[in-house]
From Swiss-Prot:
This is Small ribosomal subunit protein bS18. It comes from Staphylococcus epidermidis (strain ATCC 35984 / DSM 28319 / BCRC 17069 / CCUG 31568 / BM 3577 / RP62A). One of its GO terms (molecular function) is structural constituent of ribosome. PROSITE patterns: RIBOSOMAL_S18. Transmembrane segments: none annotated.
């Protein structure tokens, strides 16, 4: 059934990457960091997937959008 109980072990609690590493500012020019939070299709990954806190998710979204606007990151990934 779709709504039945889950089988298996306990889920691991997701930890915010930025809080854990003491990062207070997300720079839009740091494309290697931003790429970690973008899917293979080029979409921004949601909080429930990455475990990022709400504060840093907002900062991350703004940084990714700025990087896209400045052509540092693609809006969509190349089709192979």
């Amino acid at each position: 059934m779709a709504g039945g109980p889950r089988r298996g072990g306990r889920r691991r609690k997701k930890v915010c990457y930025f809080t854990a590493n003491g990062i207070t500012h997300i720079d839009y020019k740091d494309t290697e960091l931003l790429k970690r939070f973008i899917s293979e299709r080029g979409k921004i990954l949601p909080r429930r997937v990455t475990g990022t806190s709400a504060k840093y998710q907002r900062m991350l979204t703004t940084a990714i959008k700025r990087a896209r606007h400045m052509a540092l990151l693609p809006y969509v990934k190349e089709e192979q």
